[in-house]
Design a protein with these regions (language model features):
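Enriched for short, Lys/Arg-rich terminal
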Residues: 2-5, 9, 13, 20-24, ...
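Unusually extended, aromatic-enriched hydrophobic runs near protein termini
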Residues: 10, 25, 41-45
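A cross-family signal for key residues in well-ordered alpha-helices
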Residues: 27, 34, 77
């Protein structure tokens, strides 16, 4: 199943803070996310203490926070270094 990916303003704002190498890594991971959000290399996990928020790893430091928005849409909420998980 293919998912459609949408973004929040917060995600776009924080995306601009990443360096070029991190953005290139993100592009590859988003291609995988569209096809299979639970693909092993994404290391997708539900965020502890939440019902509908998930994270996946861009690399060992950068994380993306997301949630399902219906059956075929993934909404990217935030991106940043590992500490962003403390906000959720």
């Amino acid at each position: 199943m293919n998912y459609r990916i949408t973004y929040t303003k917060r995600f776009i704002k924080n995306l601009k803070r990443l360096n070029a190498a991190e953005r290139a890594q993100l592009k590859k991971k988003l291609e995988i996310l569209e096809m299979d959000p639970l693909y092993p290399s994404l290391r997708t996990k539900r965020i502890q203490g939440t019902v509908d928020l998930f994270e996946f790893s861009v690399n060992m430091d950068v994380r993306v926070i997301w949630q399902y928005d219906g059956d075929t849409i993934i909404l990217l909420l935030d991106i940043g270094h590992h500490a962003i998980l403390n906000q959720f």
